[in-house]
Design a protein with these regions (language model features):
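An acidic/histidine-cluster motif and surrounding catalytic segment
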Residues: 1-103, 114-144
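Conserved ATP-binding N-box helix of the HATPase_c
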Residues: 111
């Protein structure tokens, strides 16, 4: 099991700690997936915009892009790019802390690696339900 943090054009916030890795591993365990290798690459808006444009042909800002590198069912490997500028803006918009919103987005990426989608209203509702469930179950004590 390996979760790695990398920072591109972005400074590491104090709230992102090694202990979060255990909590994210617990999420994958609850979803009956084996965590192999997940890289969280934290960056700024422009860095993620460039990735979104180049690889997905989307010319918009986003909070996360998940690249699923899994080779076997129920085994998780991937690269998750997260804009800390976008999570900070969204935190203010949703009246939550930056740590809370970043944890939610990190869980969101894990849910994608577990096979959840968010392209239609029903899928979005399921994704939001999962995010909230795992935020409450594993992150509530450290985010309060």
């Amino acid at each position: 099991m390996a979760i790695h943090y990398f920072f591109e054009n972005s400074k590491k916030p104090k709230f992102i700690t090694a202990s979060w890795k255990k909590l994210l591993k617990a999420v994958t365990d609850d979803e009956n997936h084996k965590l192999r290798n997940v890289n969280y690459i934290f960056c700024n808006d422009e860095f993620l915009y460039a990735i979104n444009s180049e690889y997905l042909n989307h010319h918009t800002y986003t909070d996360i892009i998940t690249f699923d590198n899994s080779e076997r069912p129920k085994e998780i490997e991937g690269d998750l790019y997260i804009s800390l500028e976008r999570t900070a803006d969204n935190a203010a918009k949703f009246y939550v802390t930056h740590a809370h919103e970043t944890a939610r987005v990190m869980i969101h990426g894990i849910m994608h690696l577990c096979g959840y989608k968010d392209k239609n209203p029903d899928d979005i509702a399921i994704m939001r339900e999962k995010e909230e469930y795992y935020l409450q179950k594993y992150f509530s004590e450290i985010l309060d």
